């Protein structure tokens, strides 16, 4: 059994991670940490785990954590995974970070967007961007995996076939994305108060969202040249889910059916990416509770643009599920281990 620790186990992503790992046949949940609920059983904080997860939550003790665990997941705000990563490297253990500390390769960009000093810069070259559909082979050998952000996951998977096949003008990419409130985290804030979100729909982080440089970095690698995007996220009155609507100008004439075939070829054999038939569009309900990313492409002949729709569950494929998928890749296990389920409906 692989001894696993989860740091930040009582955030939304952390709790989903614990739930998924509890059903993993090769994992022993060895240590769960929580700054807020240390000393309490996990099931007392999350009653849906009663009789399933018996661990008592602990305060973070990095030497103890690294000594007792083979693989560590960090589900923490940015800036907090760096000291853990340094100890992981010293002790030859493995880390999957659900935060932003190791996603951006340019430390100056990280510090500009996150307003935080990067104290583990030497480890950036050791970190692998954890999108298995694109980086599976290098994830297998990695020590530090930077689990992608939720918005970037939906956007990058949505655009990858177009950029690798050089089918769109990379200067015209517009991303209009909507997320459920759980994407804002479990901490209290006025913005996510029930009275503020119910029956409301609002943009936020307009032209300033921190996922922007992550999206641009990965799209540029796919395109082979710098990419700049216009990215506007929105907060919707639902609990979970992301729907990204992406617009790009086509370079050559192509039909919806031809593009759909190109996408299916690109994602052939991928367990968690579902390319929908022409005329069928993704919904957040269609992926809720699953590790799937549903994608459709439509050619607007009149404007010579392609419209890509990409839907994920922000807490699963956008966070915890993708982290477990990365664990499976690292261990050489089937990628759907502990993830082999459809979503919940209705």
Curated annotation (Swiss-Prot):
Localization terms from the record: Cytoplasm
Pfam families: Semialdhyde_dh, Semialdhyde_dhC_1
Active site: 150
EC top class named in words: oxidoreductase
Enzyme Commission identifier(s): 1.2.1.38
UniProt KW keywords: Amino-acid biosynthesis, Arginine biosynthesis, Cytoplasm, NADP, Oxidoreductase
One GO term describing the cellular component: cytoplasm
InterPro entries cross-referenced by the UniProt entry: AGPR_AS, AGPR_type-1, NAD(P)-bd_dom_sf, NAGSA_dehydrogenase, Semialdehyde_DH_NAD-bd
Catalytic reaction list: N-acetyl-L-glutamate 5-semialdehyde + phosphate + NADP(+) = N-acetyl-L-glutamyl 5-phosphate + NADPH + H(+)
Domain of life: Bacteria
SUPFAM superfamilies: Glyceraldehyde-3-phosphate dehydrogenase-like, C-terminal domain (SSF55347), NAD(P)-binding Rossmann-fold domains (SSF51735)
Pathway(s) it belongs to: Amino-acid biosynthesis; L-arginine biosynthesis; N(2)-acetyl-L-ornithine from L-glutamate: step 3/4
Classification via PROSITE patterns: ARGC
Family affiliation: Belongs to the NAGSA dehydrogenase family. Type 1 subfamily.
Protein known as: N-acetyl-gamma-glutamyl-phosphate reductase
Species of provenance: Desulforamulus reducens (strain ATCC BAA-1160 / DSM 100696 / MI-1)
